[in-house]
Amino acid sequence: MNKQQLKAYFMLMRLHRPIPILLILWPTLTALVLASHGLPDISYLVIFTIGVVVMRTVGCIINDIADVDFDKHVARTNTRPLTSGQLSIKNAIWLCISLTLVAFICVLFLNLYTILLSFVALFLAILYPFCKRFFAIPQLILGLAFNFGIFMAFSAIQNQIPVEAWIFYIATICWTIAYDTIYALADREFDLETGIKSSAVLFGNKVFRYILLFNFLSLLLLIILGIYCDFNSFFYLGVVICSLFFVRNYFLYKKLGITNCINAFSANHWIGLIIFIIAVIQYI
């Protein structure tokens, strides 16, 4: 394998774009903190961090395999390894299988409940790329998939999925719908031409209102989480800071344009970091 092929595999796994990994990682780590009522054992941090990175790459590979014919016609995606012919579909499938096995080996160190949940996580990762063809809001499926690590974190530590896990899960789903709708704005014109489904297409000229609505719902659910868990004022201060980030992002993505939308999307990882920090503070 030469240097060019290694670079192609690197690009296929999206390791050059770590923001989506962080968007999955922060809620998962936060769930570990909530489930542990403090800093979790280092083994959980290692297993879940590896799992997030590996399954994110698996999702990207499945997405590229599913969308290879569409990506050829989009300027933003027509240089990807599969669409440009740098790697074959067969190469991608073998890599996907190998990485899935790595993720499964990681989860074998956890309890049976979490192992069973891992199959649901894999199903969601496979489903998302294809649901863009028939489901009006594929961002909902993405939210279910991206944040499923929350359930796995609680099941690994508590062997159950308590009420606070559900509240946090739904909050992050609303957050994901909002930020991925921003991302979808970059491709909305192409999606309209090809019939690809997305929330950016469905919401039409009211898309900005819906993004704000889902941001608001995520904040509201975080407040409910704080009340349910009897968190201190630092948690609510963090929620206020998150709301300021949402307002800042609004003025960015409202200008439209690929660069503005991608930048607004990417800035959301700071939201995840803030929530993680304020969760840790609760148990110091």
Curated annotation (Swiss-Prot):
The keyword Cell membrane applies. Its cofactor is Mg(2+). The keyword ATP-binding does not apply. It comes from the Bacteria. It catalyses: all-trans-octaprenyl diphosphate + 4-hydroxybenzoate = 4-hydroxy-3-(all-trans-octaprenyl)benzoate + diphosphate. GO terms for molecular function: 4-hydroxybenzoate polyprenyltransferase activity. PROSITE patterns: UBIA. Pathway: Cofactor biosynthesis; ubiquinone biosynthesis. Its main location: membrane. It is found in: Cell inner membrane. GO terms for biological process: ubiquinone biosynthetic process. Keywords: Cell inner membrane, Cell membrane, Magnesium, Membrane, Transferase, Transmembrane, Transmembrane helix, Ubiquinone biosynthesis. InterPro entries: HB_polyprenyltransferase-like, Prenyltransferase, UbiA_prenyltransferase, UbiA_prenylTrfase_CS, UbiA_sf. The chain crosses the membrane at residues 19-39, 42-62, 85-105, 107-127, 134-154, 165-185, 211-231, 233-253, 261-281. One of its GO terms (cellular component) is plasma membrane. It is an enzyme of class 2 (transferase). Pfam families: UbiA. It is a multi-pass membrane protein. Its EC number is 2.5.1.39. HAMAP family: UbiA (MF_01635). Catalyzes the prenylation of para-hydroxybenzoate (PHB) with an all-trans polyprenyl group. Mediates the second step in the final reaction sequence of ubiquinone-8 (UQ-8) biosynthesis, which is the condensation of the polyisoprenoid side chain with PHB, generating the first membrane-bound Q intermediate 3-octaprenyl-4-hydroxybenzoate. Belongs to the UbiA prenyltransferase family. This is 4-hydroxybenzoate octaprenyltransferase.
